[in-house]
Amino acid sequence: MNLHEYQAKQLFEHYGLPVKNGAVCQSVDEVDLVLAQLSGDKWAAKCQVHAGGRGKAGGVKLVQDVEEARSFAEKWLGQRLVTFQTDKLGQPVNQIYFEETCDIDKEFYLSAVVDRASQKVVFIASPAGGMDIEEVAQNTPHLLHKVEIDPLFGGLPYQGRELAFKLGLSGTQNKQFTDIFMGLSRLFLEKDLSLLEVNPLVLTQQGNLVCLDAKIAVDDNALFRHKDLSALQDLTQNDAREAEAEKFQLNYVALEGDIGCMVNGAGLAMGTMDIVKLYGGKPANFLDVGGGATKERVAEAFKIILTDPSVKVILVNIFGGIVRCDLIAEGVIAAVNEVGVRVPVVVRLEGTNAEIGRQILAESDVNILTAHSLQQAAELAVNAAKGEH
């Protein structure tokens, strides 16, 4: 679950991390009231969406007075912001965050992620702040500095000092950075985060470090023990199909292809998308129905996939480990009839009672293309998408 910048900075404040004063508005009428809470004669106005690249898309602007702030709010509130991280529809802008400005001397990058290979939290710091970190990693990897945090012990002061030295910080700034590092480490572990990013972390001309931006992603599997964070979820930022899928415990991610994919198991789902791509097709989605692929869940999966008007064919790839393939076959037939599927359906079954399942599909009166291998299934699906079935 992603948080908005203003929500992330509220958490930062709670953990004693240095941020500039800011306030959020949800209507143009609130702009004057919000700015009255802030000092200075110019402010940073930021569209609040769950996506990066806001600045390049015009979603961040330095406003010089109240009128310019109102104009920015009028332009964006109720509109959708399209960035390189969104789809072509963009994300809805429901709030504008106004923040006091500061005089910047240097910009740094600081983030933390879970490294599953080492089973630790990795902090990444770079003197190249305010830039796309992907470009830094590709073009100047020597500017990335890392330390690993053992989740049993948390961040240790010497690790913060080590990163600070590598960033060229000494004296007071070294201590400030270490304090920020320790606070972010506590925040990451105590709130079960999966991503934390400060880009940029700035050194002001007055010699103070400030978290000028904040990005936080919370592990969805840990939300049950963080009711306060769960309450911050902004469902308007979610794809409507993804939100609907969550209700039925389906893992769905919308893509931009025309071959709908329904698979049990995340790894198999990713492999299915890979082979569809290999055969020249484009997956329309990632959809994992999980181990308990019941008739009801299969039916809901069909409904969700078919809400995408781009879908020309549906590829069902099921490995019968926990579930039996004959039951899956019956569920697919029932779901196709119930939903009224009008596009070709390709089904590949493997595992427990796979042969029985294929026989059930063959004897049904439903127009289903049966595949005996994943390669054949992908080829059938790609051809069907081209109208060659």
Swiss-Prot record:
Q: Where does Mg(2+) bind?
A: 199, 213
Reactions catalysed according to its record: succinate + ATP + CoA = succinyl-CoA + ADP + phosphate; GTP + succinate + CoA = succinyl-CoA + GDP + phosphate
**Top-level EC class as recorded in UniProt:** ligase
Q: Which residues bind substrate?
A: 264, 321-323
Which free-text remark accompanies the cofactor? Binds 1 Mg(2+) ion per subunit.
**GO biological process annotations for this chain's record?**
succinyl-CoA metabolic process; tricarboxylic acid cycle
Gene3D superfamilies reported in the protein's UniProt record: ATP-grasp fold, A domain, ATP-grasp fold, B domain, Succinyl-CoA synthetase domains
Names of the cofactor(s)? Mg(2+)
**Pathway where this protein functions:** Carbohydrate metabolism; tricarboxylic acid cycle; succinate from succinyl-CoA (ligase route): step 1/1
Annotated ATP binding sites: 46, 53-55, 99, 102, 107
The UniProt keyword set, sorted, is:
ATP-binding, Ligase, Magnesium, Metal-binding, Nucleotide-binding, Tricarboxylic acid cycle
Q: Which family does it belong to?
A: Belongs to the succinate/malate CoA ligase beta subunit family.
On subunit structure and binding partners, the annotation says: Heterotetramer of two alpha and two beta subunits.
Report the function annotation for this chain: Succinyl-CoA synthetase functions in the citric acid cycle (TCA), coupling the hydrolysis of succinyl-CoA to the synthesis of either ATP or GTP and thus represents the only step of substrate-level phosphorylation in the TCA. The beta subunit provides nucleotide specificity of the enzyme and binds the substrate succinate, while the binding sites for coenzyme A and phosphate are found in the alpha subunit.
What is the name listed in the Swiss-Prot or TrEMBL entry for this protein? Succinate--CoA ligase [ADP-forming] subunit beta
**Organism annotation:** Haemophilus influenzae (strain PittEE)
